[in-house]
Amino acid sequence: MKKNLFILVALFGFIVSCTSNQQAVQTTMEPYAEGKPYTRWWWFASEIQNEDIKYQLEWLKENGFGGVEIAWVYPMRGDSTVKHPKWLSEEWAASVNYAKRTADSLGLGCDFTYGTLWPFNAFDLPDKYGTRSFYQKESPEDRTLTWDHPRKARIINHLDKEAFAYYAKQMDEGLKDAYKGSKSGIFVDSWEVETRHLWTEGYGEKFKERFGYEIEPLMDKLYQPGYEDVYYDYMTLMSDYVLYDFYKPFTDHAHTQGAFSRSQCGGAPADLLTAFMLVDVPETEAILYEPNYGRIPASAAALAGKDVVTSETFTCLYGWRKWGGKGPYQDEEQVADMRLIADALFANGTNQIIWHGMPYNKKGNGKNDNHFYASVHVGPDAYFKDQLKDFNDYMTRVSQYMRKGKVYSDVALYLPLEDSWMGVEYPDSLQMPWVWGEYELRYVFAPDYLAGYQPLWVNAKVLSEASFNEGTLKYGELAFSALAVDVEWLDIAALRQIVRLAKDGLPVIMAREPKQPGKNKSEEFGRLYGELMKLPNVSARRDDVLKQKPLLEGENLPDFWCRQDGELLYIFVANPAAKKLKYPLRYGQAFEDQGSVREVVVNTVAGPQSLQLNFRPNESLLLKVDKEGRVEVIDLGFTAKKI
């Protein structure tokens, strides 16, 4: 992350007085600086005791964790008789403040989920600030699984920055002292607001002003075949609301509190690459989102000049069951399976693990007391406790290497956002109870002809702000040798930028002839495409355009991620068994791997170097490449054992 993002107000060692008899230490330590895994820390509504807070934080420190994200949830098992402090009360805040000061004293980071569960909701939220669909005259007040369960709450309107401001004022009053000390992240989880027919006041007027026709008479046909162009226009405006009435205000507001934003933008009905670029720390999730998805937030971080890409990790490892019980094989998790997921994430750009997660428990209690239903169980009684410290140390080492220098870049790859909006719904085979729309971009991969390159996703906004000079496409600190566009649909605004850059000399792969999405078609689209394809530096064939050799060449290449640190390259190559992992994992899936070999060529600045990659079962490789072309395999020093 850019260095100036996390500069703190006071110098290391400056002591400030706080409530109670403890003191908070102001520190210049950057969040996530050491790369040690964090854990989500489930605080079930109850009487949280300081001695238990201290015990759990000390245990985390001893076991290789770097910090926590406190997440406030319902009473265990939904038991409304459990005594607990009122949400955001002074008594509630006292425990939070103690946790933050104790974390600071131990050198641990401390982030906060910005609310009780998700999406953001409030108990006394006025109707005008609540979320609603086109067909709802009032916002439903139907959230009950919250800290104050069964008290009903209302989800905020994520399309109205005034609604967020109202909500944030309440949250900041509760967290005002917890913001002191080391810099904390405030976290927003994946979208999880109902998106079908989503609406807000003034939407219809803005839509007509922008597109020249009324959307209201078409809302009941929005998801029907034949109305894809209308849905595309609806999503185009919806995206602007989501980006600039929610994600940008969320980040801007975090800065006013001396905090930073961390966000899973997954599931948002928006231009996802831009959404991830707007937050300070973009976050993916695995394995409810499969590891390939992580390349979107990783690309966003690289484009926006941010170093840290986090992942909520090991969620629903072996599957999901409804709230009220434990998931499949919960409390029996194999470290080797978890490593498979972690390595797949690293090979798609993640460089900071957030465990999901650890429940608050009294000292001496454990997984049969407080537990979260969709989570790996982290705690002194974890099934994998004997390997936990070593596993955390392994993930720390990889994370540290994957922070060195900057992201290596060679090919810019256009993200098929328009395809997803024109596709509307996933086929039944790809839908899940919580997934229906292609707008989520869950199943996008780089085309096979870019195997061995490290393509980063780009979009129309990036292209509009990029330039081509001195033989490269430049955006921020990144430089690309070529642009690949392999889509069925392409917005005319993006096509205009592609033509501009190609006329300046940018090599462009136009793998297919795209069509113009949206209800308002233009003859300009065809003319622009014709101009583009007449340019000598534009072709449908990769070999006519790409002069730069791929970083790796070979058959059936594993997934990898590369960082460039001056004249050195660090390439994390995931075990082939980690490629294209699917939800859910089979129990013990990692042990099905018997080891494998890949013969590859590493194309270095000094020339091609042949290399045999020997993958031991359930292990990945880290390569260091210097300017002379020497390739060193770095020992990552960890083998997961079967439990």
Placement of each model-derived feature along the sequence:
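Bacterial Sec-dependent N-terminal signal peptides
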Residues: 1-26
